[in-house]
UniProtKB/Swiss-Prot annotation:
GO cellular component: cytosol
Biological process according to GO: gluconeogenesis; glyceraldehyde-3-phosphate biosynthetic process; glycerol catabolic process; glycolytic process
EC number assigned by the record: 5.3.1.1
Metabolic or biological pathway, per its Swiss-Prot or TrEMBL entry: Carbohydrate biosynthesis; gluconeogenesis; Carbohydrate degradation; glycolysis; D-glyceraldehyde 3-phosphate from glycerone phosphate: step 1/1
Assembly: Homodimer.
Functional description taken from the UniProt entry: Involved in the gluconeogenesis. Catalyzes stereospecifically the conversion of dihydroxyacetone phosphate (DHAP) to D-glyceraldehyde-3-phosphate (G3P).
Lineage top rank: taxon: Bacteria
Keyword field contains Cytoplasm: yes
Lineage, opening ranks: Bacteria, Pseudomonadati, Campylobacterota, Epsilonproteobacteria, Campylobacterales
PROSITE patterns (alphabetical): TIM_1, TIM_2
One GO molecular-function entry: triose-phosphate isomerase activity
Protein's name in the database: Triosephosphate isomerase
Family: Belongs to the triosephosphate isomerase family.
Length: 229
């Protein structure tokens, strides 16, 4: 099972060094863990987890103020990227056109892409979730070999309100009809609900936000998944 930690706008270079030290001391070679860190916390050290980028601009380098490109990611050996997270779609206004440009650039370079999709509460309550997700995935090549799709219902992100196991199973089952890529769930995942989520047939892992920001909490979540699978 894959465990992806999205640290978002949390951790400094110093605090992440301590975070990484705790993970490295407790993870095993069998654990499939990735951590998406703030740019300032990138390091070139060997870890028992994979480092990933929360964002990038589809360029090697150039006149793109405030952005980071392939040249900077290459310096740290980073080749795993998040694309389409709802906070970048909703708060920062990333368009489908930009998301497609990011996807195409990442795919051209053979990067691992974690492509995030998810509906807001109004779409969910109107029963339009599946068609909404079909449209979002229609923007990319779902046959890309190094693709992972993360389903994150917007109404569950950072709210403490996770989708039910039945809801997650239904949506991941639907997404399986659209792609053969590994499927993840994200949205208020924690140590208390990971066991139930881990038992969902099409769930290949989780994209964890708040519950991953503390290294010990994240390790407890991983351990809880083993106990309850």
């Amino acid at each position: 099972m894959k465990f992806l930690a999205n640290l978002k706008c949390n951790h400094t270079r110093a605090s992440f060094a301590e975070y990484a030290k705790i993970l490295d001391a407790n993870l095993s070679a069998d654990d499939d863990v990735s951590v998406f860190v703030p740019f300032t916390a990138f390091d070139a050290k060997e870890h028992k987890f994979k480092l990933g980028a929360q964002n990038f601009y589809p360029c090697v380098s150039g006149a793109f103020t405030g952005e980071i490109g392939k040249a900077q990611l290459d310096e740290f050996g980073i080749s795993s990227v998040l694309i389409g997270h709802s906070e970048r779609r909703e708060i920062l206004g990333e368009s489908e056109r930009l998301l497609r440009a990011k996807f195409d650039f990442a795919a051209k370079n053979g990067w691992q892409i974690i492509y995030c999709v998810g509906e807001n509460l109004s779409v969910n309550e109107a029963g339009g979730t599946k068609e909404f997700l079909r449209t979002q995935l229609g923007n990319i090549d779902t046959g890309y070999a190094n693709l992972i799709v993360a389903y994150e219902p917007i109404w569950a992100i950072g709210t403490g309100k996770s989708a039910s196991a039945e809801q997650i199973a239904e949506i991941l089952g639907f997404l399986r009809t659209l792609t053969l890529a590994p499927l993840l769930y994200g949205g208020s995942v924690n140590a208390a609900n990971i066991g139930e989520i881990a038992r969902i047939r099409e769930c290949g892992g989780v994209l964890v936000g708040t519950a991953s920001w503390d290294a010990t909490n994240f390790l407890n979540l991983i351990a809880s998944s083993r106990e309850r699978i």
